[in-house]
Curated annotation (Swiss-Prot):
Residues 469-517, 606-643 are annotated as: Disordered. Cell surface receptor that plays a role in various physiological processes including inflammation, phagocytosis, and cell adhesion. Plays a role in phagocytosis and enhances the uptake of apoptotic cells and immune complexes by acting as a receptor for defense collagens including surfactant protein A/SFTPA1, C1q, and mannose-binding lectin (MBL2). Plays a role in the regulation of endothelial cell function and adhesion by activating angiogenesis. This is Complement component C1q receptor. One of its GO terms (cellular component) is cell surface. The keyword Repeat applies. The lineage of its organism: Eukaryota, Metazoa, Chordata, Craniata, Vertebrata. Residues 24-571 are extracellular. Residues 475-485 have a biased composition (Basic and acidic residues). It is a single-pass type I membrane protein. The modification Phosphotyrosine is found at Y619, Y635. Keywords: Cell adhesion, Cell membrane, Disulfide bond, EGF-like domain, Glycoprotein, Lectin, Membrane, Phosphoprotein, Receptor, Repeat, Signal, Transmembrane, Transmembrane helix. Residues 31-173 form the C-type lectin domain. Widely expressed. Highly expressed in lung and heart. Expressed at lower level in brain, thymus, liver, spleen, intestine, kidney, adrenal gland, muscle and testis. Expressed on endothelial cells, platelets, undifferentiated monocytes and circulating natural killer cells. SMART domains: CLECT, EGF, EGF_CA.
Length: 643
């Protein structure tokens, strides 16, 4: 007994020490088999969950309107302790979260969120606004409330989803968090029948003097009498029998004959009856019975205490204190036979594709690219994305099971981030034409410069019909001596044009006519100036003049004579060309002359340098000194010779 008392005393003292730091920063509400605590603190959702978990709990759940009222009551107590200055809106984390990668289900009450402590989803929800359709980041839920207003049962705190925050940035307006602690049972509060002080220390290290229900394993510290006569007693809430929890004491505490029933109704829950000697006892009203603690009353109807949980209905057995629990549709009793749990209908695979279990039921969903088939929600059929009204493709669209793909016509390639658009291919970048290339939508066409026409292959160019009608030289007049002249057939123009892909700088071919006293010669002239070189090349068809004013044709065909105006134009163009040739020749001659001059000048300089070097090598300066004879000189004449 001494050991047990010492242990209780130690637990009480340690509990008071542990709870001292948190006493001014938390509020506690205990109902049913759970306790809720509200705390101040600007923390991220992960940090708040860690704080709750340290004491054996989790961030609070709000699965029903009744539970929402318990949480609101805890917040109301917390707001009485202190309120942040200049803060109107406050948010408090609860245990509702959605992991990264999970998406929003707008047709479900929980919107795809789940409770961190586990447990089935419920139909209750109280969203502040529509949930965001995001699957790429983790989202957490907090209770949002106006801190300037007193909490009212008709205005329960709303659910607000947001990012879960970090230690450095817990989130906008985050002021604290709520924890929930579950217990196997509760003890009734201890009753004081006389003056004294009562303090409870809970297993989650909260210290309070007023609880509607005290959780299992809590320690009660009772000090009776005045300060001079104070005596401390410790009591432990423990399970006496299965499902029955008791403090281990009988009757009211701190009873004093001096006060009797006048002080706190003698500590009795219902009725207090005084004896003639100053003693008193507790009693119960009709329909109730006194429990073993001799203070608390319980209904004789076993269902009066609502023993069935999880939405179960209690049905009493006639003429006995027994009862049975019945669950609503979609639920079943667990092993305790008093708690109803949801039936997971999806285990039987009732859906064609995706099955979503809901509280008390389920619903089917189709994969992306499918839709429900008619009135049967369980069946899914393929969605034809390629219908004319909804086709996402710019050109070709092919429907597949659950999806589709786009295609482009010949001459186009796929483009866009989602590969639904088509972009024209510029075929001219590959130089498919011998001359001109013109890109068009989905194709291209080749072209030719003036005077040429496209060959049957559609790529190269040939001389046009206007060239086939022009003579290689103008027709010549033959004088037969009778005063009449006859037309002499002329040669034809040469056939094909020298091939070149770059014809942008090609000049048109022009027939030139040169007349002289003895003959008239026609010179078909083609000039091409390359865009990559500065040389000029000529393709001239030359015809030999005749001696008597006649021209000798080189072919059998004859062509009609040119007009005088054509001849004048040809002469003028020939004059320009010959002038250009003469100018180029003069420039070449000038450059050649300059080169010869520079070479000769360099040669003369070289000869002068050689001569100066030979003369200088024969002489040197000799310092003055007295010598018997003059120094030898290799250029002095040798005695006996002339040199």
């Amino acid at each position: 007994m001494v050991t047990s008392t010492g242990l209780l005393l130690l637990l009480g003292l340690l509990g008071q020490l542990w709870a001292g730091a948190a006493a001014d920063s938390e509020a506690v509400v205990c109902e049913g088999t759970a306790c809720y605590t509200a705390h101040w603190g600007k923390l991220s959702a992960a940090e708040a969950q860690h704080r709750c978990n340290e004491n054996g709990g989790n961030l609070a759940t709000v699965k029903s309107e009744e539970e929402a009222r318990h949480v609101q009551e805890a917040l109301a107590q917390l707001l009485k302790t202190k309120a942040p200055s200049e803060t109107k809106i406050g948010k408090f984390w609860i245990g509702l979260q959605r992991e990264k990668g999970k998406c929003t289900y707008h047709d479900l009450p929980m919107k795809g969120f789940s409770w961190v402590g586990g447990g089935e989803d419920t139909t209750y929800s109280n969203w502040y606004k529509a949930s965001k359709s995001s699957c790429i980041s983790k989202r957490c839920v907090s209770l949002i409330l106006d801190l300037s207003l007193k909490p009212h049962p008709s205005h329960l705190p709303k659910w607000h989803e947001s990012p879960c925050g970090t230690p450095d940035a817990p989130g906008n307006s985050i002021e604290g968090f709520l924890c929930k602690f579950n217990f196997k049972g509760m003890c009734s509060p201890l009753a004081l029948g006389g003056p004294g002080q009562l303090t409870y220390t809970t297993p989650f290290q909260a210290t309070t003097s007023s609880l509607k229900a005290v959780p299992f394993a809590s320690v009660a510290n009772v000090v009776c009498g005045d300060e001079a006569e104070s005596k401390t007693n410790y009591y432990l809430c423990k399970e006496t029998t299965a499902g029955v929890f008791h403090w281990g004491s009988s009757g009211p505490l701190c009873v004093s004959p001096k006060f009797g029933c006048s002080f706190n109704n003698g500590g009795c829950q219902q009725d207090c009856f005084e004896g003639g000697d100053g003693s008193f006892r507790c009693g119960c009203r009709p329909g109730f019975r006194l429990l073993d603690d001799l203070v608390t009353c319980a209904s004789r109807n076993p269902c009066s205490s609502n023993p069935c949980t999880g939405g179960g209905m209690c049905h009493s057995v006639p003429l006995s204190e027994n009862y049975t629990c019945h669950c609503p549709r979609g639920y079943q009793l667990d092993s305790s036979q008093v708690h109803c749990v949801d039936i997971d209908e999806c285990e039987d695979s009732p859906c064609d594709q995706e099955c979503i279990n809901t509280p008390g039921g389920f619903h089917c969903e189709c994969w992306v690219g499918y839709q429900s088939s008619g009135s049967k929600e369980e069946a899914c059929e393929d969605v034809d994305e390629c219908t004319a009204a909804y086709s996402p493709c710019a050109q070709g669209c092919t429907n597949t099971d659950g999806s589709f793909y786009c295609s482009c016509k010949e001459g186009y390639i796929m483009s866009g981030e989602d590969s639904t658009q088509c972009e024209d291919i510029d075929e001219c970048l590959g130089n498919p034409c011998d001359t001109l290339c013109i890109n068009t939508d989905g194709s291209f066409r080749c072209g030719c410069p003036a005077g040429f026409e496209l060959a049957p292959n559609g790529v190269s160019c040939t001389r046009g019909s206007m060239f086939s009608e022009l003579p290689a030289r103008p027709p010549q007049k033959e004088d037969k001596g009778d005063g009449k002249e006859s037309t002499v057939p002329l040669t034809e123009m040469p056939g094909s044009l020298n091939g070149s892909k770059d014809v942008s700088n090609r000049a048109q071919t022009t027939d030139l006519s040169i007349q002289s006293d003895s003959s008239t010669a026609s010179v078909p002239l083609e000039i091409e100036v390359s865009s990559e070189a500065s040389d000029v090349w000529l393709d001239l068809g030359t015809y030999l003049p005749t001696t008597s004013g006649h021209s000798q044709p080189t072919h059998e065909d004859s062509v009609p004579a040119h007009s005088d105006s054509d001849t004048d134009g040809q002469k003028l163009l020939l004059f320009y060309i010959l002038g250009t040739v003469v100018a180029i020749s003069l420039l070449l001659a000038l450059a050649l002359g300059l080169l010869i001059y520079l070479k000769r000048k360099a040669k003369k300089e070289e000869i002068k340098e050689k001569k100066a070097q030979n003369a200088a090598d024969s002489y040197s300066w000799i310092p003055e000194r007295a010598e018997s004879r003059a120094p030898e000189n290799q250029y002095s004449p040798t005695p006996g010779t002339d040199c």
